[in-house]
């Protein structure tokens, strides 16, 4: 895991969950965070490669990094822009 991912302030394990559960859990987790805090999401649902970037764009959060070459996928988001 790169330093970028290991420095996340919060982590969400969405392994084994299928659409729409991962994004619902991300939304719930982000709601409890302060603006500027980061969340590492670990998932294996291929739909997250589309859903998490779309969620960030729609909800005005920043997708800092993603690793989707192999499972488990990793996404690092920051609450707010």
UniProtKB/Swiss-Prot annotation:
Family membership noted in the UniProt record: Belongs to the sulfur carrier protein TusA family.
GO BP term, pick one: tRNA wobble position uridine thiolation
Subcellular location: Cytoplasm
Major location (coarse): cytoplasm
Organism: Shewanella piezotolerans (strain WP3 / JCM 13877)
Protein name from the UniProt record: Sulfur carrier protein TusA
Top-level taxonomic group: Bacteria
GO molecular function term, any single one: sulfur carrier activity
Native organism taxonomy: Bacteria, Pseudomonadati, Pseudomonadota, Gammaproteobacteria, Alteromonadales
């Amino acid at each position: 895991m790169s330093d970028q991912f290991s420095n996340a302030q919060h982590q969400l394990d969405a392994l084994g969950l299928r659409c729409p559960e991962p994004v619902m859990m991300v939304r719930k987790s982000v709601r409890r965070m302060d603006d500027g805090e980061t969340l590492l999401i670990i998932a294996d649902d291929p739909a997250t490669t589309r859903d998490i970037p779309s969620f960030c764009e729609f909800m005005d959060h920043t997708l800092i990094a993603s690793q989707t070459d192999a499972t488990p996928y990793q996404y690092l988001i920051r609450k707010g822009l």
